[in-house]
Swiss-Prot record:
It comes from the Archaea. One of its GO terms (molecular function) is protein-L-isoaspartate (D-aspartate) O-methyltransferase activity. Its main location: cytoplasm. It holds the Pfam family PCMT. Its EC number is 2.1.1.77. This is Protein-L-isoaspartate O-methyltransferase. Coiled coil: none annotated. InterPro entries: PCMT, SAM-dependent_MTases_sf. Keywords: Cytoplasm, Methyltransferase, S-adenosyl-L-methionine, Transferase. The gene is pcm. It catalyses: [protein]-L-isoaspartate + S-adenosyl-L-methionine = [protein]-L-isoaspartate alpha-methyl ester + S-adenosyl-L-homocysteine. GO terms for cellular component: cytoplasm. It is found in: Cytoplasm. Belongs to the methyltransferase superfamily. L-isoaspartyl/D-aspartyl protein methyltransferase family.
Amino acid sequence: MRSRFENERRRVIDYLRRIGIIRSDKVYRALLSVPREEFVPPQYREYAYIDEPLPIGFGQTISAIHMVAIMTEELDPEPGNIVLEIGTGSGYQAAVLAEIVAKQDPNRRGHVYTVERIPELAEFAKKNLERTGYIEYVTVIVGDGTKGYPEKAPYDRIIVTAAAPEVPKPLLKQLRVGGKLVIPVGDRFVQRLLSVKRVGEHEYVTKHGIECMFVPLIGEYGWKD
């Protein structure tokens, strides 16, 4: 018998599929598999399947479920991909990505590297990922995410879960040719979700998507504070 959280999760995810936000089976299966209630502070567990951002401390939020779905669909990760995430937060998006690139890969080759600038949030994410069994497929790094993580570059996919004034140049350099980067870009109040594909050594194609609102991406190649 499914728990209340499992029933609520299925209700929300099925609704997002019905209205066309979730389009692919891989994203549908991943969102059904990851328990969002394990990635929010205890006082917000009962609200885990309200499709809204929730506070996770330090002025940061866990994205609304529909936004995680939109960004994951746009990123289009494949089983076996090596993914870089900028802005770990509570670890929820990283777990969704790990479901696709590692757990949906028969050989478990895929991996997610995720960079968080706030040490306490990185520790929170690690504990959440350990408790839910994803830490094997996710490496959490504390640092300036606007610089990427060159140690494991190039990446098949890069996803940024905070808003930048422009696409950070280090992230473009760390993207594999044929790879894709998804990032919200704009001012501090409203952004446009960009999808950047690297089609050559020095050539990128950018697609402009929906309007969105994210917390600012702080760092050397982002907002300064």
